[in-house]
């Protein structure tokens, strides 16, 4: 072996060691960021702790009979399971284990999705490591104790199966997401596009209500009424009278005194905008490549909460996740996840740190520019495909 060959081998080993060190550091930081679960927010003490104590002391059957919890049965079963750890760990930690566990599983599926794009190499590991350390991800789960990671996990799994051309499993995963949180509807425009592109047969959409109804059966057997479990989402939609719950979207600029007309106009604007985007995308005859699929999935979960009224500060969480995947599939969009982190992070600070609502408006401006750019990018890609075909 020559001296030059020896140098090349040593250089390669050094690069590999540095890469392994970098990956280990990312995962270690992600783990450390989730060790402190002591923060107790108003939502945690007002709702979660009340439900936790009631289920622990009276049982989940009584909780269902009295309609205590304001979430779906699927979520309620998971939440009730945390009381089994009552003698082992503090209730705040037990509750936060749900989204933290979802973070870990999501990390694996982010790896799997990026591995589809890169069958060889370390980029999938980097994608997983970066995801695990994204600020809005670990803050949402380990510190805030919210459950956005749970329904988003099944959106990620759904996207994975669609990329693998297994639509039945993709729709099943989505149905589970919808059975947990209504915010799963942000993914529906993407599913409609797949249907119009003949990637999903119509009958598979029946899985959504079927899985939801099946998930309700144990709750009904425990004493809940069918009317209660089937109208949970209707009740949630009318709970708050505001156009924007500090969401960095269009409605943060509209005074809440215009709630009535603003809600009606907002719903019309949202429907027309999403319908126009779906039709425009469906009419494109170019191949639906995996790169395009992840881009369309991101636009779906970012455009939908952007144009819908009554959104909350955390509702761009799926966009925070999918934007990272998009950056690995389309490296020239590397800045997109950074900007989504910034806009979502600014919105988080109002609730968690008591900062000015003006920061949400800055986040809304960032999202306006970002979503407009993504739509323009989609258009440019479609035009390029048409030119190549001709």
Tell me the role of every PLM-derived stretch.
Residues 18-19, 107, 116, 236-307:
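Aromatic/glycine/proline-enriched transmembrane-helix motif characteristic
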Residues 1-5, 186-210, 221:
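Perimembrane helix-loop-helix junctions
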Residues 38-53, 66-78, 241-250:
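Extracytoplasmic catalytic/substrate-binding loops of multi-pass membrane glycan-assembly enzymes
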Residues 22-27, 199-220, 339:
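Hydrophobic alpha-helical membrane-interfacial segments at the cytosolic entry of transmembrane helices
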Residues 26, 30, 111, 124-160, ...:
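Membrane-embedded helix bundles of polyisoprenyl
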Residues 73, 88-108, 259-269:
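Loop-to-helix entry region of an early transmembrane alpha helix in multi-pass inner-membrane enzymes
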Residues 1-33, 115-116, 124-126, 289, ...:
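Start-transfer (signal-anchor) and selected internal transmembrane alpha helices
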Residues 2-4, 37, 229-249, 279, ...:
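Transmembrane helical bundles and short interhelical boundary loops of multi-pass, membrane-embedded
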């Amino acid at each position: 072996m020559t001296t030059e060959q020896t140098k090349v081998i040593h250089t390669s080993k050094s690069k590999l060691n540095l890469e392994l060190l970098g990956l280990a550091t990312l995962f270690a930081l992600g783990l450390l960021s989730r060790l402190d679960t002591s923060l107790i927010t108003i939502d945690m003490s007002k709702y979660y702790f009340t439900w936790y104590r009631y289920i622990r002391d009276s049982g989940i059957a009584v909780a269902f009979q009295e309609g205590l919890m304001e979430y779906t049965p699927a979520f309620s079963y998971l939440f009730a399971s945390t009381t089994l750890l009552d003698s082992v760990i503090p209730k705040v930690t037990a509750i936060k284990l749900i989204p933290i566990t979802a973070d870990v599983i999501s990390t694996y599926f982010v790896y799997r999705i990026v591995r589809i794009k890169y069958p060889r190499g370390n980029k999938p590991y980097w994608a997983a490591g970066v995801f695990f350390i994204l600020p809005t991800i670990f803050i949402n789960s380990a510190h805030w104790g919210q459950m956005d990671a749970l329904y988003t996990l099944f959106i990620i799994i759904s996207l994975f199966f669609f990329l693998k051309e297994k639509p039945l499993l993709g729709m099943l995963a989505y149905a589970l997401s919808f059975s947990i949180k209504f915010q799963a509807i942000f993914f529906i425009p993407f599913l409609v596009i797949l249907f119009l592109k003949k990637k999903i047969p119509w009958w598979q959409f029946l899985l959504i209500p079927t899985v939801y109804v099946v998930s309700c059966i144990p709750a009904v057997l425990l004493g809940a009424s069918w009317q209660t479990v089937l109208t949970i989402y209707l009740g949630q939609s009318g709970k708050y009278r505001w156009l924007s719950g500090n969401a960095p979207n269009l409605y943060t600029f509209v005074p809440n005194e215009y709630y009535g007309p603003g809600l009606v106009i907002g719903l019309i604007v949202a429907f027309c905008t999403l319908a126009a985007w779906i039709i425009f995308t469906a009419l494109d005859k170019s191949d639906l490549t995996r790169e395009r699929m992840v881009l369309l999935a991101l636009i779906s979960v970012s455009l939908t909460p952007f144009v819908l009224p009554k959104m909350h500060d955390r509702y761009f969480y799926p966009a925070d996740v999918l934007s990272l995947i998009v950056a690995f599939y389309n490296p020239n969009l590397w800045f997109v996840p950074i900007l989504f982190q910034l806009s979502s992070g600014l919105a988080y600070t109002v609730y968690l740190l008591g900062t000015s609502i003006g920061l949400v408006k800055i986040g809304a401006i960032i999202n306006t520019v970002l979503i407009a750019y993504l739509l323009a990018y989609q258009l440019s890609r479609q035009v390029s495909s048409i030119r190549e075909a001709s």
